[in-house]
A protein has these predicted regions:
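Polytopic transmembrane helical bundles with strong interfacial aromatic enrichment
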Residues: 1-280
């Protein structure tokens, strides 16, 4: 029973991670309104004619439907197990699956509002933030299921780990803000912003620079955290943050090509997942 629940939770988490990347591809390619302002239908149809923007957005919606099914199944399975069905004893897997279901409902609502309002930046940012929280919750559901990791004692997360997690989440949100307000090209050059430590230009430069400052702070903090920790998890975070910095530098210095923009989101999602795992 435990293994099935854990496998289902990991499957849902993996699909959620892939959905985050696909959502970024929708934004990067300008396909957010590939289905028009219709929701849940696409251009008023269940099976619309598929040009490239429509194909990308429709694929994103189908992937979201798959994630919805997995999360709903996980919550239903958790409820079934908590009632002790199919076994001779009560077996509680925890309530994180219910939290994931609530986050999924919020995510679906934000997705609908985002499309209906023609992609305002604030809803797109909230949409990504909620997706990251959903991913984290599913990872917690998989890792903290009783019996999922036999023989490994559970210790409560220390404050440095929680600070790293909070800093990572804020960095992700400022990255979404930078991308969705059109500030990605406001800071040329790397690591400085237009060769300035304190940009003197528009508010878009300040938004972009704030995202970078959070990223630099995250790197310094996780190195300090890893050096103090006796666990290997923080060092995996350090490695992924270094990779993310390399992708970001290449992206900015090469004029923001779409593949590197997508890679930036993919590695950013991996950093977030690694932070969650390192905290547990």
């Amino acid at each position: 029973m435990t293994r099935r629940f854990t496998r289902l939770a990991w499957t849902a988490a993996t699909f959620t991670y892939l959905l985050i990347i696909l959502g970024a591809i929708v934004r990067i390619t300008g396909s957010g309104l590939g289905c028009g302002e219709h929701w849940p239908l696409c251009n008023g149809k269940l099976l619309p004619p598929l040009d490239l923007p429509t194909l990308i957005e429709y694929g994103h919606r189908l992937a979201a439907a798959a994630v919805s099914g997995l999360v709903a199944a996980l919550a239903a399975y958790a409820w079934w197990l908590r009632r002790g069905a199919g076994s001779g004893e009560r077996y509680p897997p925890g309530k994180t699956a219910y939290v994931a279901l609530a986050l999924l409902a919020l995510q679906v609502l934000l997705g609908a509002v985002t499309v209906k309002l023609s992609l305002p930046p604030w809803t797109v940012i909230l949409h990504l933030g909620t997706a990251m929280l959903l991913l984290a919750t599913l990872i917690v559901a998989a890792k903290l299921t009783p019996g999922a990791s036999p023989g490994i004692p559970r210790t409560p997360p220390l404050r440095p780990a929680l600070y790293a997690l909070a800093l990572g989440f804020v960095t992700v949100l400022f990255g979404a803000l930078t991308a969705n307000l059109g500030a990605a090209s406001a800071c040329l050059g790397f690591p400085l912003c237009n060769d300035q430590f304190i940009p003197a230009g528009s508010y878009l430069q300040h938004i972009h620079w704030t995202h970078r400052l959070f990223a630099y702070t995250l790197f310094a903090y996780v190195v300090w955290w890893a050096a103090r920790s006796k666990r290997p998890g923080p060092w995996y975070v350090v490695a992924l943050v270094i990779l993310q910095g390399a992708v970001a530098a290449a992206m900015v210095l090469s004029g923001l090509p779409q593949p590197l923009q997508a890679a930036h989101v993919a590695v950013g999602g991996a950093v977030w997942a690694a932070l969650v795992l390192a905290v547990l």
